[in-house]
């Protein structure tokens, strides 16, 4: 009996989706670790803390109180109200509950907005380095991602002049994160004002401000383009609880923006997932309204780790690395080590090659900057114990010393 197997004809749109390199490297490092190898995983993009106890207790109480049914697509009134209050009191932003939609993580919020706003052929400006999923999201909607380059010498920030030079009649959106994943750079008030002065001259450009790392900011006050009244009605803030509250597994994100965009996102989300988890939503209310001491503690620990890890990497020759003002990543430039040869005779032509070498020989998992739009860098997370970070720095230094010209 001969059975003929025929491949399923998958849709063309899948070609626009590139596998997340952060998830791929994390998976590879876990597989290696499962074989007994002592791998230090610095590729993962989540806090190494557990969710604060009061938030977990609130979830248990929510279940006891009957919050186990379908919630409204845009989110429970309790949470939308808590988010609006947070934005008003902490950020000075005049968003009401009707301006907010709660989604299954900030990634979901981003994709909702991009699908709601982008038509085929629209250009979306994304300052590089950028989060790995931005280009795929844009292409999935039929848009064209336009990367704006930066450098370690500029602290990985794009000037207002450079931003203006990339705007064309096809530009529909500006999408950026601050604090930035992967560089950790934070746009300050002066820099954002300069961007604002450019953007007011182009009223057809919508702005998506990804502020998921807001709570992990070592530079002082968090600043947002949404603070400028001149941009009102054409900007949306994307945020969530994953990073600042160590709630990555709860999948809680939100968009705050113009009501018509919220209504559009509600339609899209209603088609895909309906409302986000009701128990997690009630736990998130407690996160916003409860004590914030654990949030501050986590930020302080991250800052201490940043300082120690940056100092250790700075001892490695020819490895420029900015001192980030936010998030929990270092983004060193590895240009000097590209083109060198491993002891086994393999030439490391790209940052991808170098990351595989670090994992296989140094047993340190990092993510290539190629995925973030910066091919000469690698991303190293310091969401790990300080002892592990020091050990990782030693392994990286040794791996680099073993390379030959």
Predicted regions and their residues:
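Conserved N-terminal alpha-helix of the aminotransferase class I/II PLP-enzyme fold
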Residues: 70-103
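A glycine-/small-polar-enriched, mobile loop at the entrance of the PLP active site in fold-type I
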Residues: 43-46, 61-80
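PLP-dependent class I/II
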Residues: 3-10, 14, 18-20, 25-28, ...
């Amino acid at each position: 009996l001969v059975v003929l197997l025929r491949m399923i004809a998958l849709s063309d749109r899948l070609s626009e989706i590139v596998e997340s390199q952060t998830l791929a490297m994390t998976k590879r490092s876990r597989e290696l670790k499962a074989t007994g190898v002592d791998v230090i995983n610095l590729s993962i993009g989540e806090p190494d803390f557990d969710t604060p106890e009061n938030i977990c207790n609130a979830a248990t109480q929510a279940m006891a109180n009957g919050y186990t049914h379908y919630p409204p697509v845009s989110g429970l009134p309790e949470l939308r109200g808590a988010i609006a209050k947070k934005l008003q009191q902490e950020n000075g932003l005049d968003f009401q509950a009707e301006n907010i939609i709660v989604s299954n993580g900030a990634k979901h919020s981003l994709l909702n907005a991009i699908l709601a706003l982008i038509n085929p052929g629209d250009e979306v400006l994304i300052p590089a380095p950028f989060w790995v999923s931005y280009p795929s999201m844009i292409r999935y909607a039929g848009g064209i991602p336009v990367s704006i380059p930066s450098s370690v010498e500029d602290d990985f920030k794009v000037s207002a002049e450079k931003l203006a030079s990339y705007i064309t009649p096809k530009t529909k959106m500006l999408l950026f994160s601050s604090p930035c994943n992967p560089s950790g750079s934070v746009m300050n008030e002066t820099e954002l004002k300069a961007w604002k002065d450019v953007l007011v001259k182009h009223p057809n450009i919508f702005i998506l401000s990804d502020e998921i790392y807001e709570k992990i900011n070592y530079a002082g006050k968090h600043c947002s383009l949404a603070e400028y009244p001149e941009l009102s009605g054409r900007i949306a803030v994307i945020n969530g609880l994953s990073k600042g509250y160590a709630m990555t597994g709860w999948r809680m994100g939100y968009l705050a923006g113009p009501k018509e965009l919220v209504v559009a996102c509600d339609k899209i989300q209603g088609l895909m997932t309906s409302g986000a988890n009701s128990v997690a939503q009630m736990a998130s209310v407690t996160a916003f309204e409860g004590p914030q001491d654990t949030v501050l503690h986590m930020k302080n620990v991250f800052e201490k780790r940043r300082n120690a890890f940056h100092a250790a990497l700075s001892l490695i020759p020819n490895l420029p690395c900015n001192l980030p003002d936010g998030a929990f990543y270092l983004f060193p430039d590895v240009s000097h080590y590209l083109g060198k040869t491993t002891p086994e005779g393999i030439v490391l032509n790209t940052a991808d090659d170098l990351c595989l070498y670090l994992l296989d020989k140094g047993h340190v998992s990092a993510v290539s900057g190629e995925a973030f739009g910066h091919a000469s860098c690698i991303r190293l997370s310091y969401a790990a114990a300080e002892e592990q970070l020091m050990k990782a720095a030693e392994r990286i230094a040794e791996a680099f010393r073993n390379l030959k010209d």
